A protein has these predicted regions:
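Short, positively charged and aromatic/hydrophobic N-terminal segments
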Residues: 28-31, 38, 45-46
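Juxtamembrane regions of bacterial inner-membrane/periplasmic proteins
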Residues: 46-458, 479-481, 532, 561, ...
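Flexible glycine/proline-enriched surface loops and loop-helix/loop-strand junctions
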Residues: 104, 203-208, 283-288, 321-328, ...
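Active-site loop and adjoining helix of the penicillin-binding protein/serine DD-peptidase-beta-lactamase fold
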Residues: 209-215, 288, 292, 348-366, ...
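Short, well-structured active-site flanking segments
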Residues: 233-243, 318-321, 381-385, 491-494, ...
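Conserved catalytic neighborhood of penicillin-recognizing serine enzymes
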Residues: 249-276, 331-334, 399-405, 522-583, ...
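Glycine-rich, acidic and aromatic/proline-enriched surface loops and short helix-turn segments
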Residues: 264, 268, 272, 306-310, ...
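A penicillin-recognizing enzyme superfamily signal
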Residues: 435-460, 470-474, 483, 489-495, ...
């Protein structure tokens, strides 16, 4: 045998010494004699080692026992650490649950203004389907003007509502009767489950809807066991044969493949990183054993079903079978069919690869494989297998956004929530938040804005890129029913309804007129205002000379017509007579919280407000002088359904009823004969709607704010870069408002007459009293004692004279 230079010969004492040096780490034992004897076998080596007293010194049984004990202590410590992690996770809050937000529930009661077609749209939005099959929740049937609906169970703020089988009768455009078919008695009120509109998610953007094991269909559990872990109920967390296969695969560089039990999968997803190493696999095995040691199979299975990843919706991760059922099938987990359950279980292996929307054939093959495995285990009869395999995938269309279809509204909700809750609580405590959003109103607002802006751009060739915003509220209680933050209502970016602060123009004029009408001894709707040239001088700034939009002056103008036609000069002179401070103070009382600049130009709207701020101001007018803070939230419940906070109605009367009633009458004149007369193209005059147009310098901003008997809406139209839009309030925002209200079928505006207000016939030209049969006479409201006492000469028209004769004849 050829000896390498400097090498110790195997079998020699030098070989033993070198081996000892490597074992002990002591270089004193190194031996490197090139002339050493060689040729001895392994027995000689062993003999040499045994003879070395130094080796016996370094490697005694006592030392080996100490090393073993140290390793056992390390393993025990590591096991205790893992045990702490397992118990802490399972016995504490297992999941960071997002806050879940819901729209208003549809409340059904006799007399409700609702058409059968509108009800069908509502049911479709909620995922209810035809035909009716027994008492299965989420189903309905229509029989002419009658409906049978099995309403889903739901936990509301005032308690849990069980599943209910309802019978509804319609008469015309309203609901005439509501009956509970199970108890065979009429109901005064029934609710449908509310529409889920979005969530406030944890930082990792995981979303899930927790379910209890008893809420999971048995066939889904069977499918999971059949395809993922047949011995789940027999093993103690690991499957030795599968584990051996996985270990060999990892050791040979083929990665960890198969062999994982459901418990191991849960541990891997719940605690560990996705790396594929033996160290991680060993940790996974140890933790799986600990989980099985402390918790029963039902608890493990329930946690698994809530944890498993089942898809992606934009930046939102879909976790758990509860949310996956809603995401893929649009219905609660309890309502899943056998093939739907098998499809979900099949996706566990690879939610992206088996995505039924992107890869329907793969998903179908995987589903059928799951069904076949169930049949092998005699979980299905042959007929059940055949029927399930022939069923379509029946997956709903994917939502257009990853978080919510109503981002602008949810932006408002989040801002209001942050006044009362910490961000971490909103992202992890699983709060149930009931909002004021009305999906019908929201959809109508979005469609109206999109439709009318497109029409404006088509009519004005070369004009593109117009933007807009809409806010709609309930007149009576200030609940925000819709918020549209831009032309693309689903864009989760700049929210113009809340953050676009633009000059409001003539929308601020009603504040001046309200201020005047608060002094009935000086101003009434019939008072003549001076609309002649005005020069206002203030120290330190250039003279201010307001002009009217039509570039003309109109002399003596009745107060109500000065507002109806939005005359700038008459309005500015009126505001200056009252005093700038009084007008701006009343703006604050109406609800404008922003500091307004104390300049004369502010009287004509040289003030920047967001559409939501304008809405708050007009809300106080529409509610008769009662300031009602706008609210987007009704109730907040814990994840367990316990009340946390109720957002009660806060009302403060900030103006007497009489001047607000008079102002409302003047705003109705804006619609009937003023700058908003164009609304007649959209809505019938008998509705007596009230509103105000707003136009800013160089036609940069187009505004309209108006209200009916039940709703208030504010619309802004313009460009984001503040360039001129070439639109007045009447040509831009008003058509959007009119289209919206036409879709919503508003109630007439008929505010009650205050006790201290009377109606008097007035001559429009002079502002003096007149007989109602006189030409040019109009009936106006006055605070009692403020109407003019002097009468104008009556120039009776033949028509009015004849009508008066007939009236006196039959009185």
């Amino acid at each position: 045998m050829e000896q390498l230079p400097g090498a110790a010969v195997e079998g020699s004492d030098s070989y033993s010494r070198n081996l000892l040096a490597r074992v002990s780490g002591d270089r004193r034992f190194l031996y490197n004699d090139a002339n050493a004897t060689h040729g001895a076998g392994p027995f000689a080596v062993l003999k040499g080692l045994m003879k070395l007293s130094t080796l016996r010194h370094y490697l005694t049984w006592k030392r080996l026992r100490l090393i073993g004990l140290a390793l056992l202590l390390l393993l025990a410590g590591f096991t205790l650490y893992l045990d702490f992690r397992v118990r802490d996770a399972f016995e504490g809050r297992r999941f960071a649950l997002p806050a879940r937000l819901y729209a208003r529930p549809l409340e059904l009661f006799p007399g409700l203004k609702l058409t059968p077609d509108a009800l069908i749209q509502e049911l479709a939005r909620l995922g209810y389907k035809e035909p009716l099959t027994g008492d299965e929740p989420g189903r309905f049937a229509r029989h002419g003007n009658s409906f049978e609906i099995v309403a889903r169970p739901f936990v509301f703020w005032d308690g849990a509502q069980p599943a209910r089988k309802l019978h509804l009768d319609f008469r015309g455009d309203s609901l005439s009767g509501v009956h509970d078919l199970q108890s065979d008695r009429p109901l005064t009120l029934a609710r449908l489950d509310p529409l889920y509109i979005g969530g406030i998610y944890p930082a990792h953007n995981e979303d899930r809807l927790l379910v209890r094991l008893e809420e999971v269909p048995e066939q889904l559990v069977q499918a999971l066991i059949a395809i993922e872990d047949r011995k789940f109920y027999k093993h103690h967390g690991i499957h030795l044969r599968g584990m051996a296969r996985a270990t060999v695969a990892t050791a040979t560089g083929r990665g960890v493949q198969g062999g994982s039990t459901l418990t191991q999968q849960l541990v891997k997803n719940f605690f560990l990183s996705p790396e594929r190493t033996l160290r991680r696999k060993a940790t996974e095995i140890l933790m799986a054993l600990l989980v099985e040691l402390h918790y029963d199979k039902r608890d493990i299975l329930e946690t698994y079903l809530n944890e498993i990843y089942l898809g992606q919706d934009g930046n939102r991760a879909i976790h758990g079978v509860g949310l996956a059922s809603q995401f893929y099938f649009g219905k609660p987990l309890k309502e899943l069919t056998l093939p739907e359950s098998a499809l979900l279980v099949g996706m566990v292996k690879g939610p992206g690869y088996y995505d039924p929307r992107r890869h329907p054939e793969r998903a179908r093959e995987r589903r059928d494989l799951v069904l076949a495995e169930m049949a092998k285990l005699e979980m299905l009869l042959p007929a059940q297998l055949a029927a399930a395999r022939s069923a379509p995938l029946d997956v709903i269309e994917k939502p257009s956004m990853g978080t919510t279809p109503y981002p602008a509204f949810l932006d408002l909700v989040r801002r209001q929530l942050r006044r009362d809750y910490h961000e971490d609580d909103l992202r992890s405590e699983g709060l149930h938040i009931f909002t004021t959003l009305d999906p019908v109103v929201q959809t109508s607002a979005e469609q109206a804005l999109t439709k009318r802006l497109a029409q404006i751009e088509r009519a004005r060739k070369g004009v593109t890129g117009l933007e807009g915003a809409v806010v709609v509220t309930n007149v009576q209680n200030g609940e925000v029913q819709a918020v549209v933050g831009g032309r693309d209502a689903h864009f989760e970016g700049f929210n113009r309804a809340l953050d676009a602060h633009r000059p409001v123009g003539s929308l601020l004029k009603p504040v001046t007129y309200l201020s005047a009408l608060m002094h009935p001894e000086r101003y009434t709707l019939a008072t003549l205002l001076d609309d002649s040239p005005l020069v206002w001088k203030e120290r330190g700034i250039p003279d201010w000379q307001p002009e009217n939009y039509d570039k003309t002056f109109h002399g003596q103008v009745p107060l109500r017509l000065a507002l109806a036609h939005s005359y700038n000069v008459a309005s500015a002179r009126l505001g200056l007579e009252l005093g700038l401070n009084e007008v701006l103070d009343n703006a604050r009382r109406l609800g404008v919280e922003r500091e307004l600049p104390p300049y004369a130009a502010s009287l004509l709207g040289a003030v920047e407000l967001a559409p939501l701020e304008v809405t708050q101001m007009y809300q106080t007018i529409a509610s008769g002088g009662f300031r009602v803070p706008l609210r987007a939230i009704r109730e907040v419940l814990t994840a367990a359904g316990q009340p946390v906070q109720r957002y009660t109605l806060a009302v403060e009367q900030v103006f007497e009823a009489a001047p607000v009633y008079l102002l409302t009458s003047a705003l109705q004149d804006v619609v009937s004969e003023g700058t908003a007369v164009g609304l007649k193209e959209f809505l019938p005059p008998p509705l007596k709607l009230a509103g105000k147009t707003g136009t800013t310098d160089e036609l940069r901003d187009s505004w309209f704010a108006g209200f009916s008997g039940d709703r208030l809406a504010v619309v802004w139209v313009g460009y984001d870069d503040n360039r001129p839009a070439g639109l007045t309030g009447a040509s831009g925002a008003l058509p959007v408002w009119g289209e919206l209200m036409r879709m919503l079928d508003p109630e007439p505006l008929a505010p009650p007459l205050p006790e201290d207000v009377e109606r008097v016939w007035i001559d429009t030209a002079s502002g003096l009293r007149a007989d109602r049969d006189c030409a040019g006479a109009i009936e106006l409201p006055f605070v009692r004692g403020s109407a003019p006492e002097e009468s104008a000469p009556c120039a009776s028209s033949p028509v009015k004279k004849l009508k008066g004769w007939f009236r006196r004849l039959f009185e």
